[in-house]
C-alpha cells in the first residue's frame, strides 16, 4: 500500500526548482532561533545537501554558529518573509522550514501569513516546528524527487 502511495505522490509532486540540489528556505522567529541552531547543528550534514536561503539574522546564525553556506535575504520584519514568498511563487524554493514562535506577537504578521498561504497555494512542504522540520529534511520523498530531477 505504501508503494502505491509513494508512486502516486511522485507522479503529482516534484521539486519546484530546477536546481541540482533542493532549495530550502529557513526562517526563525527570535524566540526560536536557539532551537533552530541546536536543530541545524545536529542535522548539519543533512542540511549541507540543500541550497539554503534564509532571512537576515537567521542566515547569520546558520553561517556563523553552524557553518552552513547560506544565501541571505533581508530580515523578516523588513520584508524577508515576502522575499521568500516571492521565491516560492517563482518556483525557486522546494521546501520551507519556518520556526514560528506562536506565543509572541509579530508586527509583520501579514507577511508571515502571506508566506504560509503561498506555501499552501504552491504545494510547497512547510515545517513550522522542530518536529515537522525533522520529518521534512528526513523525507525519503525529497530524496526521490531529487533523483527524479537529475
Enumerate the language-model features and the residues they cover.
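Non-catalytic terminal and connector segments of soluble metabolic enzymes
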Residues: 57-59, 106, 112-126, 130, ...
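Short, glycine-/small-residue-rich phosphate/pyrophosphate-handling segment
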Residues: 131-150
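Mid-chain, well-packed structural core segment of small domains
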Residues: 78-117
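Short, solvent-exposed amphipathic alpha-helical segments in soluble enzyme
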Residues: 39-45, 112-114
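General beta-strand structural signal in soluble alpha/beta enzymes
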Residues: 53-55, 72-74, 98, 126-132
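Short internal beta-strands
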Residues: 49-58, 62
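Short active-site oxyanion
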Residues: 24, 45-52, 122-124
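Short hydrophobic/aromatic-enriched beta-strand-loop microsegments
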Residues: 51-52, 68-79, 148
